[in-house]
Amino acid sequence: MGHVPRNLPTLLMIGFEELRIISWNVRGAVHEYGKLFIKELIRSKKPDIVLLYEIRCQFAQVSHYWNSLGFFPAFVSEAIGFSGGIWVMIRTNFGLSTRLIHMHGQAITFELWKDNLSWVCNAIYASPIPEQREILWQHLTQLRESISIPWLLVGDMNEVLQPSEVRGGDFIPSRAHRFASVLDKCRLIDLGLVGGNYMWFRNRNNIIILSKRLDRALGDVDWRLAFPEASVEILTRVHSYHSPLLVHCGGQEHSTVLQRPFRFAWINWIGCVLLQ
């Protein structure tokens, strides 16, 4: 894993302000309902990058579909049967450069740059198996040592931080504490949410019996300083148990009375890790 050079000092990311990233655990990228919903998401939200997880197919099965949407597979970690899979899809006329830093079974790390400005993005699909998820936590902790430019992580963490992030099920303090310790070691904070509190739902007889906040966006101080107006929006849930997330790097065009983006007034690391 090579060292990622640093931009000094941390600057506002001019040229990245309009960047939009959709992140979604799609639970089957070949399903017709899922494909219709993705097409509508791209039409209405106009993302530049689409991160998909739990793919349940090979990219070759849907390559023509994505080409018709104007996206290409920048980085792909294929699913093994119905298990795993991460796709980083980028708009064809993106206008920014990308470089793969590291491919991991539960994470794809890549760099985006324009002119002399760059930052790192991680697409995360944490395993639902705690022992496998621990491998990811160790990987991210090691990765932190090689990254010295702004760092954003987006995806399905398959873990919660607080009791308030679970409704209808058990909160497991030991696992939440381990997740919080990883964020602390990696110097990451939660970027907050607009539009709700939960991203994953389990239904029984069309009644929601369990809700959790498994998906989130995390950034380090450098990333937040570079994107002070950035916000994270929960989108409508269709087809999957997970709601998509939309990261507005430059902030939403129209403010609402919903939660404002996190501001640094700042920073006790342990307190921030536990702050929603």
Regions found by a protein language model. Name each.
Residues I80-G85, P130, N197-W200, V238-S240, ...:
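A short acidic, often aromatic-flanked loop/helix-cap motif at beta-alpha or helix-coil junctions
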Residues L210-K212, R216-A217, V221-Q276:
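Surface polyanion/phosphate-binding segment centered on an Asp-His-Pro turn
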Residues D48, D156, D215:
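Conserved acidic residues
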Residues M1-W151, L161, G169-I172, K185-C186:
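Short phosphate/oxyanion-binding micro-motifs
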Residues P73-S77, L96-T98, R202-N206, V232-L235:
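Short, P/G- and charge-enriched loop/turn segments at secondary-structure junctions
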Residues Q61, L96-R99, P150-G155, C186-V194, ...:
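Short helix-interrupting loop/turn segments at helix-coil junctions
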Residues P163-R167, Q259-R260:
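Short acidic, glycine/proline-rich loop/turn micro-motifs
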Residues F75-V88, C186-A217:
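Active site of divalent-metal-dependent phosphoester/diester hydrolases
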